[in-house]
Amino acid sequence: MAEALYYGGRQRQEQPRSTQLVKATTAVVAGGSLLILAGLVLAGTVIGLTTITPLFVIFSPVLVPAVITVALLGLGFLASGGFGVAAITVLTWIYRYVTGKHPPGANQLDTARHKLMGKAREIKDFGQQQTSGAQAS
């Protein structure tokens, strides 16, 4: 039967031996089945590679350029799709900014715009002072 053990001041029930035996048996059966399945997959992979390798060697002058072409086409489509999504995102952000819906980052853009306008005004004033001082002398 189950025995009561005291662990850390608390009572803990230990499982009966039959339950432990069932758990151990289930674990061994499941683990063994998976191990056998892994061995069969490994054997199938080795046999498949052994039979397919000569075909790869014979057809490699055709397969290598074809694989390179397909890879480049796939990367091109992936890049163009990514650029398209980025463009749509940027255009959506600009639309929200122009219509006054205040998209994320609009405060930073406004701050940068005001700083640039202030610096441009300072440079303009400095240039006017320099030209008026040069004309007076």
From Swiss-Prot:
Belongs to the oleosin family. One of its GO terms (biological process) is reproductive structure development. It comes from Arachis hypogaea. It is found in: Lipid droplet; Membrane. Pfam families: Oleosin. May have a structural role to stabilize the lipid body during desiccation of the seed by preventing coalescence of the oil. Probably interacts with both lipid and phospholipid moieties of lipid bodies. May also provide recognition signals for specific lipase anchorage in lipolysis during seedling growth. Expressed in seeds (at protein level). This is Oleosin Ara h 11.0101. The chain crosses the membrane at residues 27-47, 55-75.
